[in-house]
């Protein structure tokens, strides 16, 4: 199976599927269709019934091979790659039996090293797929796509493995936060599902951040600096003042675990007008609401010193902690936990310091935890995939299909 995984992952990552946050279409880039169409053909070749809509949501069905009434389980992965780094001309490299020493990435000056990425100690002895240093790898989330496809291939070639109805979805635009926006939960018609979009071995994640975006707009008054006294209002300095009033330790680089943060993503402007773009994250819903409230309070405090209120704040929620929807459905976690135990995989249920498509899908009525893929260092040239861990992830998908039968055939 290992060589099959390498071949399939190579085939997928060399197709450029980078999404574009500036686009208003779905998918956001035409090139995402290249992989979607390939997957549609490959699913059909496996004997699955497929359904792809005009917005790039590819669904497929593996019919049940048992005569009992079972819930339908779904597996999902996104096909787009991050816009944060070059995603074209991906040239994957294979490292057999990784020995823990630094790896030079192609002909670049970039080095993949445990000194910088200590999690790589966990994949010593594994076969790795890495980049040549000029692009991201795209294992986020093409590794998840591979794992689902390899599991389907295994199930279709081993009819002795009993399973209920399985639904599969490959989706666009997750990397720009739009993955589930046009996802038709009713058409997908699963009772619960799993995103194959995690990272390190053993991850089984059912808690995510609550997430919002905030746009702070500072309006200034531009006057010639030679006659600016008591007349100029510098929008750049207003933005600086606004950010200084936020808790300086509650930022991504100083938080971990369940700790939330404010993240200043971008500043753009001049004396006349300056905008600050933030993301707000917290696992606790009450703390999340307080964080948003704090931005408004800072705005009001600064504005109170001016006749014309110069600062505006616009806040938009993006997704919520999926744990609120998954915890009332404990079987959705218990099933993969039993599979992990049978396979000897230690389950790591630490919260996601981020979100997945499952964060939004869970609030759309489809409880969807997240499972490891065996990849790390996403969105850049240091991304890598452990083929050994990917092989385990394939076994998890197959195991969940089996465990649904074991759970409900009583």
From Swiss-Prot:
GO terms for biological process: peptide catabolic process; proteolysis. It is found in: Cytoplasm. Its main location: cytoplasm. The keyword RNA-binding does not apply. It comes from the Bacteria. Zn(2+) 1 binds at residues 78, 140, 197. GO terms for cellular component: cytosol. Belongs to the peptidase M20B family. It catalyses: Release of the N-terminal residue from a tripeptide. It comes from Staphylococcus saprophyticus subsp. saprophyticus (strain ATCC 15305 / DSM 20229 / NCIMB 8711 / NCTC 7292 / S-41). Zn(2+) 2 binds at residues 140, 175, 379. Cleaves the N-terminal amino acid of tripeptides. Keywords: Aminopeptidase, Cytoplasm, Hydrolase, Metal-binding, Metalloprotease, Protease, Zinc. Its cofactor is Zn(2+). It holds the Pfam family Peptidase_M20. HAMAP family: Aminopeptidase_M20 (MF_00550). Its EC number is 3.4.11.4. The active site is at 80, 174 (proton acceptor). This is Peptidase T. GO terms for molecular function: metallopeptidase activity; tripeptide aminopeptidase activity; zinc ion binding. The gene is pepT.
